[in-house]
Regions:
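Selective transmembrane-helix segments that form parts of the transport pathway or gating/packing helices
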Residues: 87-114
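A structural motif at transmembrane helix-loop-helix junctions in multipass membrane proteins
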Residues: 132-164, 216-218
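Loop-to-helix entry region at the N-terminal start of transmembrane alpha-helices
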Residues: 43-61, 189-197
Length: 218
């Protein structure tokens, strides 16, 4: 199981690196969005605005990045993978790959924000931990949605239509607790909310793991 998951993650990195334009398109989107925000606010930006713009840019870049999760397994290749890999291993490998991808994307977005808009992060450790939880929860939901989209002939509208409502509960909680990491963070006070976020990410992961085999056999 572990070997199969590792090979799936490795294969995804190799395939995506062969088509580097997907990586570069995400980087260009982040750079252009943050730079536009910089021009609009002319360096005068509050912590609340910094936080809101960060999550808006991150969630849309995450949707765009995860859309390609099953780009290489669509159509007839689903039958080939069905005979070679267990669906549970496949979805876990995809989720791990997307988690690493999204976490790197979030770090790059925060770095660009800090460079252009100023460093508003008061507690770096808390912010990085919150971003990790966000990447895990987003990757689980978006990977499953990408699988549905692949089964529907890679309809480009489905990921945005399905994922935004599913991500909304996590996004609201994330934006609130991440704002506290900008203005002043206490681990003791925010521990219950962090536990809720961790449980939401875990539930998203378990649902993707349990439901994907049924989608795979369809």
């Amino acid at each position: 199981m572990i070997e199969q998951i590792y090979q799936i993650v490795k294969l995804n990195f190799r395939l995506e690196w062969q088509e580097r334009q997907s990586y570069f398109s995400i980087l260009i989107y982040i750079l252009s969005s943050v730079y536009l925000s910089y021009l609009v606010f002319s360096e005068v930006i509050s912590a609340e605005t910094w936080n809101a713009f960060f999550w808006v840019i991150f969630i849309f870049s995450a949707v765009q990045a995860a859309y390609r999760s099953f780009h290489y397994e669509a159509d007839q290749r689903f039958l080939l993978y069905y005979g070679m890999v267990k669906p549970e291993n496949l979805v876990l490998g995809k989720i791990i790959y997307n988690f690493l991808y999204l976490y790197a994307t979030g770090l790059f977005t925060a770095l660009v924000f800090t460079f252009l808009m100023g460093n508003e992060i008061n507690s770096l450790g808390a912010f990085l931990f919150i971003l990790l939880l966000a990447s895990l929860g987003f990757s689980a939901i978006l990977t499953f949605v990408a699988g549905i989209s692949a089964k529907a002939s890679n309809n480009p509208a489905l990921p945005a239509i399905l994922s935004i409502p599913l991500l909304y509960p996590q996004l609201i909680s994330l934006s609130r607790v991440s704002l506290r990491s900008l203005t002043g963070f206490s681990w003791e006070v925010n521990a219950p909310l962090l536990i809720v976020l961790a449980l939401l990410s875990l539930v998203s992961l378990l649902l993707s793991f349990l439901l994907f085999p049924y989608l795979w056999r369809d």
